[in-house]
From Swiss-Prot:
One of its GO terms (molecular function) is SNAP receptor activity. This is BET1-like protein. SUPFAM superfamilies: SNARE fusion complex. The modification Phosphoserine is found at S9, S37.
Amino acid sequence: MADWARAQSPGAVEEILDRENKRMADSLASKVTRLKSLALDIDRDAEDQNRYLDGMDSDFTSMTGLLTGSVKRFSTMARSGRDNRKLLCGVAVGLIVAFFILSYLLSRART
């Protein structure tokens, strides 16, 4: 960088400055290329994450619909009369037992 101060002729100084300028321009071009590549990677990653989140949104929407329907049917069954109370208790106990069996099996499968 300080070579231009030691040069004797004006042509030599211009040549040294020109080489240094080209070197710095090449360095800048490579940095710009890396930044552009990084920006494109970030853009692709953001698009992928948006698609993933949109898919999750539709999954949650469909699951909400299923749960809403199940709760409505369960509430209707609970309000329909005393004869169904035994059935309702049986279903509730069955679901609780199934939950514990499933959690036990999953804990055994992990180990």
